[in-house]
């Protein structure tokens, strides 16, 4: 761990975070931001260096897994023994990106917090999948994070007309960048879109070049990358942890491991209408609570039938809506159980205090 002076405002520290810290019972202790999440510990950048921190027992056993710290969280910790510490509190999360864990249970996994933008990275080869891009965008918008589609490895050659046609409904709503680390001007345009103090998380499948993009944006090698496989022409999975790096004179970048599946953790399925431009037509539906599935007088269905709304986009909306509905229903039931668990924990604490 390093000993250095860090300007935490470059990492996003603000007056609002300071006020939140004053509410904590641990307000007189050190604070910092988690820059790397390991399996059982965390690297926390503070004003006087980087600390390797663990959690207190109360935090481990008094919280559900999706409330454990994640990369990007601002935490309060007690330093000890030369750049080591114990995390005692987490400041309230904002703009946290989650995904549904694999499996049938509605468990969420926190990927990163205090995120301003999400760079949704796909490579212009066999990895390109507009339906997968829509899935990432849906989750990002749920958390009030700005989605940006980054189509990487443009040097591989692709049918640009076909790509443009596939993403036109995305490009009408969100920024789209075509990039290649072998084409510096494309990296420059992407870098110019990141402002000072802004936090950007990179998400996407394995081998799309997320770590290489982070290195290119920083102008130096800050993350490990792998060579291209000669047999497949694809990058190998490199990132194994969620890691934050600071750009010189600009924002904060968070690299994440590639994912094979990205399950939706959306509480309100109705929010999907905004992403798919369905809300543009929904205003003309006969019923204000129309779900745009089989209701009479549905302007959305009419737009699909007359070709104004792409039927593939509409089918994607239905699929994601069903998935979001199942998650929200399961999440509601799970939260009732968690409330009972929280009451039990508080009761145990009270009993201990009385002994």
From Swiss-Prot:
Gene Ontology terms, MF aspect: GTP binding; GTPase activity; metal ion binding; rRNA binding
Cellular localization per UniProt: Cytoplasm
Gene3D superfamilies to which the protein is assigned, alphabetical: Nucleic acid-binding proteins, P-loop containing nucleotide triphosphate hydrolases, Probable gtpase engc, domain 3
Superkingdom of this protein's organism: Bacteria
EC number: 3.6.1.-
A GO CC term assigned to this protein in UniProt: cytoplasm
Enzyme class per UniProt: hydrolase
UniProt function note: One of several proteins that assist in the late maturation steps of the functional core of the 30S ribosomal subunit. Helps release RbfA from mature subunits. May play a role in the assembly of ribosomal proteins into the subunit. Circularly permuted GTPase that catalyzes slow GTP hydrolysis, GTPase activity is stimulated by the 30S ribosomal subunit.
Family: Belongs to the TRAFAC class YlqF/YawG GTPase family. RsgA subfamily.
Subunit structure as annotated in this protein's UniProt entry: Monomer. Associates with 30S ribosomal subunit, binds 16S rRNA.
Protein name: Small ribosomal subunit biogenesis GTPase RsgA 1
Organism: Bacteroides thetaiotaomicron (strain ATCC 29148 / DSM 2079 / JCM 5827 / CCUG 10774 / NCTC 10582 / VPI-5482 / E50)
Source lineage: Bacteria, Pseudomonadati, Bacteroidota, Bacteroidia, Bacteroidales
Gene this protein is translated from: rsgA1
């Amino acid at each position: 761990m390093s000993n250095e002076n860090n300007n935490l405002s470059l990492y996003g520290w603000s007056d609002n975070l300071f006020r939140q810290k004053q509410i904590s019972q641990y307000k007189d202790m050190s604070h910092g931001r988690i820059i790397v999440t390991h399996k059982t510990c965390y690297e926390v950048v503070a004003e006087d260096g980087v600390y390797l921190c663990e959690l207190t027992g109360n935090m481990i056993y008094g919280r559900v897994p999706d409330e454990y710290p994640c990369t990007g969280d601002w935490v309060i910790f007690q330093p000890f023994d030369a750049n080591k510490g114990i995390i005692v509190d987490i400041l309230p999360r904002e703009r946290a990106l989650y995904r549904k864990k694999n499996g049938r249970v509605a468990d969420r996994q926190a990927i990163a917090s205090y995120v301003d933008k999400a760079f949704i990275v796909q490579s212009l080869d066999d990895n390109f999948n507009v339906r997968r891009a829509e899935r990432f965008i849906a989750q990002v918008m749920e958390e009030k994070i700005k989605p940006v589609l980054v189509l990487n490895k443009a040097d591989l050659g692709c049918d640009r007309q076909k790509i443009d046609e596939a993403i036109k409904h995305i490009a009408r709503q969100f920024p789209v960048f075509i990039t290649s680390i072998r084409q510096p001007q494309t990296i420059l345009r992407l870098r110019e879109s990141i402002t000072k103090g802004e936090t950007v998380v990179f998400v996407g499948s394995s081998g799309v070049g997320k770590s290489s993009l982070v290195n290119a944006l920083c102008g130096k090698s800050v993350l490990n990358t792998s060579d291209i496989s000669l047999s497949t022409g694809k990058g190998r999975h490199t990132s194994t942890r969620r890691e934050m790096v600071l750009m010189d004179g600009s924002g904060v970048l968070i690299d994440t491991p590639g994912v094979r599946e990205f399950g939706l953790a959306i509480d309100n399925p109705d929010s999907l209408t905004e992403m798919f431009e369905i809300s543009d037509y929904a205003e003309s539906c006969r019923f204000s609570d129309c779900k745009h599935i089989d209701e009479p007088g549905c302007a959305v269905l009419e737009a699909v039938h007359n070709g104004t709304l792409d039927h593939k986009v509409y089918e994607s909306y239905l699929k994601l809506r069903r998935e979001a509905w199942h998650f929200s229903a399961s999440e509601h039931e799970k939260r009732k159980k968690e409330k009972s668990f929280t009451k039990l924990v508080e009761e145990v604490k009270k009993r201990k205090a009385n002994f």
